[in-house]
Amino acid sequence: MKCGKPVDYRYGEHTADVLIQAYGCTLEEAFKNAAIALAELTYHTEKVEPRYAKEITIDYNDLEGLLFRWIDELLFLFDTEKFAISREIVLNLGKNDVYYIKAVLYGEPYDIEKHGFTGLIVKAMTFHMMEIRQIDDYWMLQYVVDV
């Protein structure tokens, strides 16, 4: 059928990534805010009650690798257990031979009716454009996730 359409379909450029910058007065606070920012892409963390606790211990040789493993572990918890994190996170970050995080995440099973859906499903963490730096009296963590 003839009409004014140019073609039946067209593929356009689309970026399937989201860049996140998380800030904190301390490195620990920045890592906590990185976790909350990740969760907020999918649901409303302020609606999550801290009913259950999940302990996480991770380590890595450098801070960039530690950030990657931190976000990757949070994605794993949501993907496999549908564990929605609340804004209540107890996090200890330190360094012995390697950097480590010992954290307790508080939350509950994800419920779309209660927690909502903010529009994105995060598929994976990436090292693309990752940056961790101290700026004056605060820290900035930057990372990109694939959605």
UniProtKB/Swiss-Prot annotation:
InterPro entries per record: Archease, Archease_arc, Archease_dom, Archease_dom_sf
Domain of life, source organism: Archaea
Gene Ontology BP annotations: tRNA splicing, via endonucleolytic cleavage and ligation
Keywords in alphabetical order: Calcium, Metal-binding, tRNA processing
Single annotated GO MF: calcium ion binding
Pfam families: Archease (PF01951)
Keyword Chaperone: no
Binding of Ca(2+), residues: D17, D146, V147
Role played: Activates the tRNA-splicing ligase complex by facilitating the enzymatic turnover of catalytic subunit RtcB. Acts by promoting the guanylylation of RtcB, a key intermediate step in tRNA ligation. Can also alter the NTP specificity of RtcB such that ATP, dGTP or ITP is used efficiently.
Family: Belongs to the archease family.
Database matches in NCBIfam families: PRK00407.1 (NF001617)
Protein name (Swiss-Prot/TrEMBL): Protein archease
Protein's organism: Pyrobaculum islandicum (strain DSM 4184 / JCM 9189 / GEO3)
